[in-house]
Regions:
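Conserved G/P- and acidic residue-centered "switch" motifs that form tight phosphate/ATP-binding loops
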Residues: 31, 135-136, 192
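Conserved AMP-binding/adenylation subdomain of ANL enzymes
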Residues: 151-170, 175-255
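Structural core segment of the AMP-binding/adenylate-forming
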Residues: 2, 29-103
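Conserved AMP-binding A3 loop
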Residues: 128-154
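Conserved pre-ATP/AMP-binding loop-to-beta segment of ANL
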Residues: 84, 101-132, 139, 162-168
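Conserved S/T- and glycine-rich ATP-binding loop of Class I adenylate-forming
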Residues: 10, 27, 59, 127, ...
């Protein structure tokens, strides 16, 4: 509906959300290549380099990240479509995600089989994503992963763990990382299990503060983490225990 063609590179610059996951799955169905970008990137060099290097034709962007794109929009003439996740006044050349969905429903009502044929025609060696390295020591490198890379990782992971369809997980890691991709939602989708994402706040700190409440709401069977995040969780728990007094802290240590 947006004119995106098979093989086109489409970036996603947004906080982790259900809309993020749905956007990428939609790109795969259209035969496009997803270019997930970290929300920590600054527009001056980091974003410009990656979007130019990947030859991005379109972009899904959250309302919180949109100001970055607006500041460099004139330097990205090859970007033809900007789809905005979230409610915010739009400028020329920007389309709300809700509008795109309506256009998509209308397109599918007239071209359903034509569209589904694109997805059926995707091969194992077709590109799925281009994920960029941090670029701390040199220019970032675009790591190309095929659809078979992902399905193989899912198969290998499921040979080591069992995920019943009744399981739930809450993704607290950035979705631009391959680990969150494979174990966070592709494994869950393959098993028919449930994926939830953290409620996005106006700032990264606000989003972090939503995690405990979201855990209580979702009651996940497991969480994905990385050492740095696990360390921060431990510090937060220990700080909370100490605040309750020596007796509580002593019982915690004994446990």
């Amino acid at each position: 509906a947006s004119g995106i063609r098979p093989g086109d590179k489409v970036a996603i610059l947004a906080e982790g959300s259900n809309a993020w996951i749905i956007s990428e799955l939609g790109l795969f169905y259209a035969g496009a290549v997803s270019v997930p970008l970290s929300v920590k990137l600054e527009e001056s060099n980091d974003l410009l380099f990656r979007m130019r290097h990947a030859e991005v034709k379109a972009l899904f962007v959250s309302k919180y990240q949109l100001p970055k794109i607006r500041r460099i929009r004139a330097e990205l003439p090859e970007v033809k479509h900007i789809i905005v996740i979230g409610h915010i006044p739009l400028e020329p050349g920007e389309t709300a995600l809700g509008t795109l969905r309506r256009l998509g429903r209308d397109y599918l009502s007239k071209h359903r089989e034509e569209f589904l044929a694109i997805g059926r025609g995707i091969g194992n060696d077709d590109y799925a994503t281009i994920t960029y390295t941090s670029g701390t020591t040199a220019d970032p490198k675009g790591v190309v992963l095929t659809h078979r890379n992902y399905t193989a990782n899912v198969e290998q992971s499921l040979s080591r763990i069992d995920i019943p369809s009744s399981f739930r997980t809450l993704i607290i890691l950035p979705l631009d990382h391959c680990f969150a991709h494979v174990v966070g939602f592709y494994i869950m989708i393959a098993c028919g299990a449930t994926v939830a994402t953290v409620q996005v706040g106006a700032t990264p700190m606000e989003t972090l503060k939503n995690i405990p409440q979201n855990i209580r709401e979702v009651r996940p069977h497991f969480l994905l983490s990385v050492p740095a995040l696990a360390k921060n969780f431990r510090k937060s728990i220990e700080s909370s225990i100490r605040a309750k007094g020596r007796m509580t802290e002593g019982l915690f240590r004994l446990a």
